[in-house]
Amino acid sequence: MTLLSNILDCGGCISAQRFTRLLRQSGSSGPSPSAPTAGTFESKSMLEPTSSHSLATGRVPLLHDFDASTTESPGTYVLDGVARVAQLALEPTVMDALPDSDTEQVLGNLNSSAPWNLTLASAAATNFENCSALFVNYTLPQTGLYCNWTWDTLLCWPPTPAGVLARMNCPGGFHGVDTRKFAIRKCELDGRWGSRPNATEVNPPGWTDYGPCYKPEIIRLMQQMGSKDFDAYIDIARRTRTLEIVGLCLSLFALIVSLLIFCTFRSLRNNRTKIHKNLFVAMVLQVIIRLTLYLDQFRRGNKEAATNTSLSVIENTPYLCEASYVLLEYARTAMFMWMFIEGLYLHNMVTVAVFQGSFPLKFFSRLGWCVPILMTTVWARCTVMYMDTSLGECLWNYNLTPYYWILEGPRLAVILLNFCFLVNIIRVLVMKLRQSQASDIEQTRKAVRAAIVLLPLLGITNLLHQLAPLKTATNFAVWSYGTHFLTSFQGFFIALIYCFLNGEVRAVLLKSLATQLSVRGHPEWAPKRASMYSGAYNTAPDTDAVQPAGDPSATGKRISPPNKRLNGRKPSSASIVMIHEPQQRQRLMPRLQNKAREKGKDRVEKTDAEAEPDPTISHIHSKEAGSARSRTRGSKWIMGICFRGQKVLRVPSASSVPPESVVFELSEQ
């Protein structure tokens, strides 16, 4: 879960529209004395408080026993036979001193009064009409002044005796709100509901303090946001979530295709791609879980807007929601560990010569997959104990709890270590470039390009998540769009750079495409064997120059003209342009032996001087070569595109590639 999810779902994935209204009105009403940092909001009832007595049933205690021995309490207790009323001086110190005594004890103390028990039994109402229906036909005994019933758009407050501090359980249906705590509403001595503190105007419907309902992490989040324009924050978060879903879908597609490429072609199975594949698997797992949760929340939000009911499949399923978030954090932790392995392996191969000959795959696998299991298990256990999932909140806001640093601490350490690896790798690259006598501008360009390419692979862009500016909506928008663009498209960028734009991968794909086309009846697409080696067999026609027979040092050697292209390549790209005649005879020996057996000879022993090639075979070979050249000449532009990367096809094996060549190739692209 991210800060974006906290702002989107803050106070209620179940009732997003209601919580948006709560935040808007909480911000407009100012801080409360009992919770200076929490939100508060005004009642929406248009009824004027009167001295008429009406009562209906309520679902939670409205009165709270106050310890008379407390020095801050100047109140007295009055027992009129109907209810036990605490006359309290509503000073901030007194409100802070109110104890959170057991609700059942309060109910037990008031059991002797039947009318008051009705008030404490239930007060379930979902709108103004329901609240009105509860109280309009019930009359209290003439025992004193009462504040009239009122509906504050969240709770239905029954008539309350004058001078009483009414407390009602916090409304359900919101994430980040503890329903075991109480919202507070003050009935003044004159029978009117009290306005918010420091208010310049009297508000007849009164004011409800919902500050105590928020959990500590939500209060800290509201402190960070500071601004009162909560609608702007929520709107920015929604647009960012749309951008995030698009990036995750694109990353998922690119990562899956890259995994298929790495697993299909055996020539790509080297040490670097083994690490790449594990990193891609961790990223795919993380993206799939995140998309599942986001789409479930999106579907739930749309349905609630129309029906005001929760249709969430994941959140309303016991253990499924918790398991989803635990798996999400495990996948994220595994992704960071494999990013660390990427940085460690590349750094050691470039800078430490002792690691170049070894590849501890088992150690890397345990570090990348087993260590995150241990970390996630410890975090999940601590979080479940801290959050009390019996409230049905499904680990919501767990990223705001202190236990989240069990996971976030090692991730931050991985980012910092990879940043150090990156700095050292760039230092080595600059040293190599200086030895090549490149210009300063060229050195800087290649170093910066290599650094930019390595940033997503090493996960350094995730460092921006730790720097969330929430003081103003503008700063939050810049941070939100930029950070979530980089993180959601991270998988796409990694797959693009390290798979689709990799020269070796493109060469393998090109060769596979050419082979498939040649098998399907397009011989002109067949890859030439010569392109896989440093030298090539000379297929020039017989009109090519031949060394004079009188020269003993060059007898029997055929030489290609210096400016003639060989097999579609320049002469400078071939290290061998001459083929010895004995080698040709050696290739023809099986044919000569078969011909001798047909004539009935038991054994054929010929030396290089005795063996003569069959002119018929040579004629057939020349004819086939001429036919191939004619077909090639007809589709020259196609062949040029297909085998434009034949130089890349001559990449040596992974073991012989210099360790720093990976970074150099990236800087050249």
Swiss-Prot record:
Q: Where is the composition biased (Basic and acidic residues)?
A: 595-609
Task: Name the GO terms of the biological process aspect.
Answer: adenylate cyclase-activating G protein-coupled receptor signaling pathway; adenylate cyclase-modulating G protein-coupled receptor signaling pathway; cell surface receptor signaling pathway; circadian behavior; circadian rhythm; circadian sleep/wake cycle; circadian temperature homeostasis; copper ion homeostasis
Q: Does the keyword Metal-binding apply?
A: no
Q: What happens when the gene is disrupted?
A: RNAi-mediated knockdown in small and large ventral lateral neurons increases total sleep in both the day-time and the nighttime and decreases sleep latency during daytime only.
Single GO cellular component annotation?
Answer: plasma membrane
Spell out where the chain is glycosylated. N111, N117, N130, N137, N148, N198, N308
Q: Where does it reside?
A: Cell membrane
Membrane topology per record: Multi-pass membrane protein
Region of interest (Disordered), ranges: 24-52, 536-573, 590-614
Q: Which SUPFAM superfamilies match?
A: Hormone receptor domain
Extracellular compartment residues:
1-244, 296-334, 388-411, 471-480
Span-the-membrane segments of this chain are: 245-265, 275-295, 335-355, 367-387, 412-432, 450-470, 481-501
Sequence ranges of Low complexity compositional bias:
26-40
Family membership? Belongs to the G-protein coupled receptor 2 family.
Q: What is this protein called?
A: PDF receptor
